[in-house]
Amino acid sequence: MSHRYIPLTEQDKNEMLNSIGAKSISELFDDIPTDILLKRNLNIAESEAETILLRRLNRLAAKNTTKETHATFLGAGVYDHYTPAVVDAMISRSEFYTAYTPYQPEISQGELQAIFEFQTLICELTDMDVANSSMYDGMTSFAEACILALSHTKKNKIVVSSGLHYQALQILHTYAKTRDEFEIIEVDLKGTITDLEKLEQLIDDNTAAVAVQYPNFYGSIEDLEQINNYIKDKKALFIVYANPLSLGLLTPPGTFGADIVVGDTQPFGIPTQFGGPHCGYFATTKKLMRKVPGRLVGQTQDDEGNRGFVLTLQAREQHIRRDKATSNICSNQALNALASSIAMSALGKQGIYEIAVQNLKNANYAKNKFEEHGFEVLKAQSFNEFVVKFNQPIKNINLKLAEYGYIGGFDLGEVSDDFKNHMLVAVTELRSKDEIDDFVTKAGELND
């Protein structure tokens, strides 16, 4: 007997076999040699009741180490931040959750307005003129910024700080493999900060752009004003990869004269998911607007004078003229951009500032605690991350810390021999003083 909700009953199978003139399912596979055909049933357990299955899955999930079971001090590009409850409630609405911006976009006014608000918020944070609708993540945003600089300046050299996230640099090198005469010059660090003397020496008339991270991968705050002074005389573009939460407290890159500001909005409303998805942002000066990758939403008026939103400057995009497009990015991270927009709006300017201040205070408190326990903390101005030197391999330290209920910091020895036995520690607003105290105490015991 057929069941309304369970497909492929015995009756269904027989009806299909009869309609094609086959006597059995095995007859459908007669063309497969019998010596390689499996003749037994698969070793799959019998089905279970939903309640029993749910308990089993919960027991399996309980074996995972997560930020719900452990206090985390891991950052390196993905951070454990507070997400206002309204974020999930809003992005779960079917109008947003299932929406896809069509190529007749004006019929999705709600979606377009949400993207427009995202662009506006990014411009306010970065002190830039124009922002696009989003990118896949911060690292691809960074690579696209370098491509824009090459196209705009007609030069072929990108000077990048070694303080950029190592994965962002890897993506840039991947992009370089697809282009002729594209040179990437990496500037060494002095401690955990870009060596400004070497940077100045490497910038020449053939430099398309200079790129730094703010704060950088090692948590240190670069001197954007001084770097911009080096760049201006050479007519190169200034690219800054910035943590958007830090801009609630730090002077935004646009104020220092940055031409392109990129980054990842993960700190605003996007959870620490394994591998993503994230949401990249891309902001520029007005003069570069027509070379921005991805979609731009603009505000306009209809025939009756009502405010409306449209996709603007679409001739830049790959669906209009693929061979001459500014980029081949098409679909953006609209749902995650919406999550970030809601988080930023819910927090407000003052809320973002207060959370940024709490990150700074917690990180400085943790620094002092590490030093009190005899650790060497690498000296540099920082936001919510810093580097601590250990006597033991970080991998071993982190395995032990997990037993105490902590997710330890990033093992910098995995990306640089210069930082063997060094841990990148992230301390956000969610970490309490008791957690910080106990984490540092346990780390000190393991380091002896």
Swiss-Prot record:
Keywords: Oxidoreductase. It catalyses: N(6)-[(R)-lipoyl]-L-lysyl-[glycine-cleavage complex H protein] + glycine + H(+) = N(6)-[(R)-S(8)-aminomethyldihydrolipoyl]-L-lysyl-[glycine-cleavage complex H protein] + CO2. The glycine cleavage system is composed of four proteins: P, T, L and H. In this organism, the P 'protein' is a heterodimer of two subunits. It holds the Pfam family GDC-P. GO terms for biological process: glycine decarboxylation via glycine cleavage system; nucleoside metabolic process. It comes from Staphylococcus epidermidis (strain ATCC 35984 / DSM 28319 / BCRC 17069 / CCUG 31568 / BM 3577 / RP62A). Its EC number is 1.4.4.2. Disulfide bonds: none annotated. This is Probable glycine dehydrogenase (decarboxylating) subunit 1. NCBIfam families: PRK00451.1.
